[in-house]
A protein has these predicted regions:
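PLP-dependent amino-acid enzyme catalytic core
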Residues: 2-117
């Protein structure tokens, strides 16, 4: 059995893609938490790859990564009573930073667990 067949065999559910309305709701929810980041193009890469290439520059996001969008959306979708208890995540990277910043901006207590190595 090949590696790809093994992976395919282990997939047990289908991913439900968000609808356009879901994306618009998320955009409205997180709007005050994120920077609007540019989309750039490269005519050099377009020619080499023979297609149009777009770069969404999420490195200009608050804390420097797209994770800010998901973290802030997750917090803002949570039940207000649950948020009073605070939030927690286990991450040593961009998601930890995004949860910490989103929580701070929302006045929510956050616990970030980071590995030692």
């Amino acid at each position: 059995m090949s590696y790809s067949e093994t992976i395919q065999e282990n997939i047990t559910h289908k991913v439900k893609l968000p609808k356009k309305e879901d994306l618009k709701k998320a955009q409205l929810r997180i709007n005050k938490f994120i920077n609007r980041t540019p989309v750039l193009t490269s005519s050099t890469l377009d020619k080499k790859l023979k297609c149009k290439v777009f770069f969404k520059c999420e490195n200009f996001q608050k804390m420097g990564a797209f994770k800010m969008r998901g973290a802030s959306n997750s917090l803002l979708k949570m039940n207000k009573n649950d948020l009073k208890k605070g939030v927690a995540t286990h991450s040593s990277g961009n998601f930890a930073q995004a949860v910490a910043l989103s929580s701070k901006m929302s006045g929510i207590k956050a616990h970030i667990v980071m590995p030692t190595n």
